[in-house]
Amino acid sequence: MNHSWIVFTAMMTTAACGGEDGSNPSPDAGFEVDAEPGCDPATVQPSAYRPIAMVSTGAVDVTTAGGITTGTLDATAGGTASSADRPYLYVDLRTGARVDVDDLAARSSTAWDIALKRSSLRVNGGDSGPGDRRLAVVPAASLAEVTAAPATGYTSDDFTSDDCMLVTIPGGEPMSAFGEWYEYDLEAHSLAPKPEVYVLERNNGSRTALRIVTYYGDEAMPMRGAFYRVEWKHLP
């Protein structure tokens, strides 16, 4: 028998962070989740984040200098109103390039490191993919503060409970190794990344430190949400 749960968001759910046109945000009412027996992670995801058989066209525009890669990742997913029907943006931090796989193919792909869609972030491991990537969260206000990878504290995405229920962060996004990565301003209806650096570890032992500079990285449209400005470096 099917069961339906409503997972309510805290005034936003990615959407409350500016539409594609930069207009004032409005909160979503919530997500409807239909869960079937078997605990396939794809079936317990809220409708806004269900796998889509489409490849993202979001731009990954980065440059590397002095060992630091900086730039923007367009995870706007067509804007707030259209995002439920648009895929995640998949990125390989080793090459600084978009990985052109749809959400369905990404579940069996080891080519990508992180995925982004509005304010939902994922790593290729655990419930999100077979890549065996793990993430450690390091309290740090700048990338320069992280000179070596932590020895412990790595986790993978885990948004499906043992009894096949959806696990979310307070904003309504599926729980990932990034955890509660942002603070939400109820008055301004905007979000700001926490002062954290995320160290991604791959199964070959290589590690990359990533910092989210801002969720509003489009200089031409400052209130356009999910246009990430990021920086990262590879650790020894």
Show where each model-derived region lies.
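Bacterial N-terminal signal peptides that target proteins for export
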Residues: 1-6
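Hydrophobic helical h-region of N-terminal Sec-dependent signal peptides
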Residues: 7-11
